[in-house]
Amino acid sequence: MRKEIFTKEQLELLPLIQMFSGRFGLVGGTAIALHIGHRRSIDFDLFSLKGFNGSSLDKKIRRYAKIDEVIVNRRGEFTILIKGVKVTFFHYDYPIVFAERLDKIVKMPDLLTLAAMKLFALGRRAKWKDYVDVYFILKNHYTIADVVQKSKEIFGSECNEKLFRSQMAYFADVSYAEPVEYMKGFEVSDKAIEKELIKFSLS
């Protein structure tokens, strides 16, 4: 795993993340970056296949760390800011397997599962960093057919291949609010990414 993608603040939070490793697994862009090493991480997304109580998480966390801000506390999601790092706890309704581990700290899905989750979420939140992740996955690791097949296994009838492909090539509503910091050797222009994603969408 490519732990160099973490910021100093994230490394300091790993013992806290480990406290919840029995119920939650690490997903999203941070988990993808740990597999690939392409960009700096900025947050932690922790998913559970079972429900949880946000207020109980709040109390447990405050015994070990100062919470700067509670951003979301509703059924199925608890998002906070600690040391400037956004940490999200989320109840995930789909059957994913946490087959990998970051040392003995936290479990994670394999890269193909993470790719399927990322592509499935693409149309729900158009952030440039998500397109960057998809680009590196399809460029160096899996074909679009691989990812679509995995998506069908996880999301069943909700998997829409035609929609996936169109979303990959549509950039009009993309948010660039969260800048992408590439790790050394992975630098690439936005235009090059857009060009390749359009090609992938047609492949």
Locate predicted features:
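Compositionally biased terminal segments of proteins
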Residues: 1-203
